[in-house]
Amino acid sequence: MNYIYPVNQVDIIKASDFQSQEISSLEDVVSAKYSDIKMDTDIQVSQIMEMVSNPESLNPESLAKLQTTLSNYSIGVSLAGTLARKTVSAVETLLKS
C-alpha cells in the first residue's frame, strides 16, 4: 500500500459502490477494512525486515528505498490509528443519541 501517491477518483467511486452479500453491518465493514489494513501492514513489515537484513542494503539507493518504505509504513500506521479513533468516536456519538 503506497500512501504518498494521490488516490484516483475512480477508486473512490468504486469503493463507494461497495456492495456485498457477506457484509451486512457497519461493524462487519469496519472489521473487514481493518483486517485488510492489518494484512497490508504485515506485508510492509516483512518487506522492511527483508530490506534491513540484506547485507547489500548499505548502498545509497537501497537506503533511500528503505527510508521511503519506512515513511510509507509510518504514514499508514498513523492513518489506521487515526481512523480507529475516529470510528470509535463516531460509534460512541451514535450510541449516545
Swiss-Prot record:
Q: Which domain of life is it from?
A: Bacteria
Return the InterPro entries for the record.
T3SS_SctI-like
Sorted alphabetically, the keyword list is: Plasmid, Protein transport, Transport, Virulence
Gene Ontology biological-process annotations: protein transport
- Function summary: Necessary for the secretion of IPA invasins.
Give the UniProt family note. Answer: To S.typhimurium PrgJ.
Supply the NCBIfam families for this chain.
Answer: T3SS_SctI
Name of the protein: Protein MxiI
Supply the source organism's classification: Bacteria, Pseudomonadati, Pseudomonadota, Gammaproteobacteria, Enterobacterales
